[in-house]
Amino acid sequence: MAVYVADPALDVRQHEYEMVWVIQPEASEERIEDLKSRISQVIQREGGHISTIDVWGKRTLAYPIKKYFEGYYLLYHFEMDPEGTDELERLIRFTEDIIRHLVIRLDE
């Protein structure tokens, strides 16, 4: 379901997204919190709103990814302008601690 902003000055169409990302298993709690903060800041800076953050914790991977057999999983539900996802993807791609991610648009 698309959400329309009521303020005409901010007349952008926002979409609902779900993002799962997997962090290297040996990442410290401080590093995980730092990554969560950076991702959240990008979403908010791009005009988005985070609905929920679910921490799934450390889980065994179905197959090795970058020589890792486990990963620390997080799930985000958020709304944001489609053009803002480019900046989010850029941040995730250039963060070495994130070994896998998937962003899915939920509406439609």
Label for each model-derived stretch:
Residues 2-108:
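Structured, basic alpha/beta domains of bacterial-type, RNA-associated proteins
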